[in-house]
Amino acid sequence: MPLSGTPAPNKRRKSSKLIMELTGGGRESSGLNLGKKISVPRDVMLEELSLLTNRGSKMFKLRQMRVEKFIYENHPDVFSDSSMDHFQKFLPTVGGQLETAGQGFSYGKGSSGGQAGSSGSAGQYGSDRHQQGSGFGAGGSGGPGGQAGGGGAPGTVGLGEPGSGDQAGGDGKHVTVFKTYISPWDRAMGVDPQQKVELGIDLLAYGAKAELPKYKSFNRTAMPYGGYEKASKRMTFQMPKFDLGPLLSEPLVLYNQNLSNRPSFNRTPIPWLSSGEHVDYNVDVGIPLDGETEEL
């Protein structure tokens, strides 16, 4: 027991020491793995979709497979090599060009007479999506601003802005935008997504409509046996003829014409009234009252 005049000894706190050991104070932080810190909602969404452990991620993957199957089955000729050359003339004349191997689309804006060389281009993409082409040929005139590479990534759009045509090895700015689906019809006609609301094209209205074959209808309709022509010949029953007599108006009968004779259903202690006859009710008023007895 400490004396009243001396202070109590300070007890050693183990909780603070444990917290300092966990944090490490910068010395043991490398040995403690706290995991990856995710603060962006987009990273959380992409990670959940890639796990395939919940119902939403499975539906997302199935939807991607259905979209790819729909594009391939409904437009198989669009993604062939011959159709790419056919759609090339419908592209805008500012440097857009389609790829044949990877089914990509590159689009470049060239400055004064810049022409893409064979070694590199403004929108060239190889097997790796992060590969960027560099190096331009000698300055020319009338060349496209961007040229598609041989093995481009599917569903990519490359934007290139080369330097001047005199510079042999100029570095261009490459921006890659990944899209899941680009309609080849919108791409060929040059329709912007904002103009889809205003522009309505009915492709079925332009083609010649073939005459439909005249098949026999087997619907269950009330048709006589053999058709109407044979049934009219076999019909022997005829409706009998009869003369209609003159129409006579029926007399209007009114019951209880005198409304005063109608009974009243009010909740009053009034007896029923007869049909207009006077009725006298005899009520005995002088009823003898019996006196009280001794028992009461």
From Swiss-Prot:
Residue list for modification Phosphoserine: 82
Keyword Nuclease (UniProt): no
Keywords: Cell projection, Nucleus, Phosphoprotein
Cell location: Nucleus; Cell projection, Pseudopodium
Keyword Cytoplasm appears in the UniProt entry: no
Tissue: Expressed primarily in skeletal muscle and specifically enriched in the gastrocnemius, which is composed predominantly of fast-twitch muscle fibers. Detected at lower levels in heart.
Molecular functions (GO terms): actinin binding; FATZ binding; molecular condensate scaffold activity; protein serine/threonine phosphatase inhibitor activity
A Pfam family this chain is assigned to: Calsarcin
Single Gene Ontology BP annotation: skeletal muscle fiber adaptation
One Gene Ontology cellular component: Z disc
Disordered: annotated span: 105-172
Start-end of Gly residues biased regions: 105-117, 134-170
Subunit and interaction comment: Interacts with ACTN2, ACTN3, FLNA, FLNB, FLNC, LDB3, PPP3CA and TCAP. Interacts via its C-terminal region with MYOT.
Protein role: Myozenins may serve as intracellular binding proteins involved in linking Z-disk proteins such as alpha-actinin, gamma-filamin, TCAP/telethonin, LDB3/ZASP and localizing calcineurin signaling to the sarcomere. Plays an important role in the modulation of calcineurin signaling. May play a role in myofibrillogenesis.
Protein family per UniProt: Belongs to the myozenin family.
Protein name in UniProt: Myozenin-1
